[in-house]
């Protein structure tokens, strides 16, 4: 079973993430940031990851620390659950539309953290959610999961649709990358022999 639970406590946030990479998309989300819960639900459903996230943060100041630290803790949990990466497909990509919006996400479990985030948001906030925090979420994830991640919103007018397609595509790309390949069972997906 590829499951993990990670608890991360700082003076700003207390985060618990539990996940099963081979799940069915069940989720239990309570971050204190409703729009983040909505986006995490997209990862769970489209990634077929069972996901529990509980967070308590200094949201009376700003949502920044909570959103970033959830990304960090999710990255740590994915890295822990995936283990030595033997037998995984390693790469995943997805295109996802939502009405006028279309996004592409490509992920590589390379062991080399890198983020290319290109989303020309049409407004600064979705409700009360600051769209810049989405970059902090993915940067936290990338740095602690050890992945290279390319995120491109190819078109969109509605900022909610833009970001929702990003998170749905991320879930689907993640699902493809961590999927076990029977033909590569027990093998590290790299000519170097390690990732």
UniProtKB/Swiss-Prot annotation:
E.C. number(s) listed in UniProt: 4.2.1.19
Gene Ontology CC terms: cytoplasm
Keywords: Amino-acid biosynthesis, Cytoplasm, Histidine biosynthesis, Lyase
Main location: cytoplasm
PROSITE patterns, per the entry: IGP_DEHYDRATASE_1, IGP_DEHYDRATASE_2
Alphabetical list of SUPFAM superfamilies matching this protein: Ribosomal protein S5 domain 2-like
Gene Ontology molecular function: any one: imidazoleglycerol-phosphate dehydratase activity
Family matches, as InterPro entries: IGPD_sf, ImidazoleglycerolP_deHydtase, ImidazoleglycerP_deHydtase_CS, Ribosomal_Su5_D2-typ_SF
Intracellular or extracellular location(s): Cytoplasm
Catalytic reaction equation(s): D-erythro-1-(imidazol-4-yl)glycerol 3-phosphate = 3-(imidazol-4-yl)-2-oxopropyl phosphate + H2O
PANTHER family named in the record: IMIDAZOLEGLYCEROL-PHOSPHATE DEHYDRATASE, IMIDAZOLEGLYCEROL-PHOSPHATE DEHYDRATASE HIS7
HAMAP family linked: HisB
Protein name as catalogued: Imidazoleglycerol-phosphate dehydratase
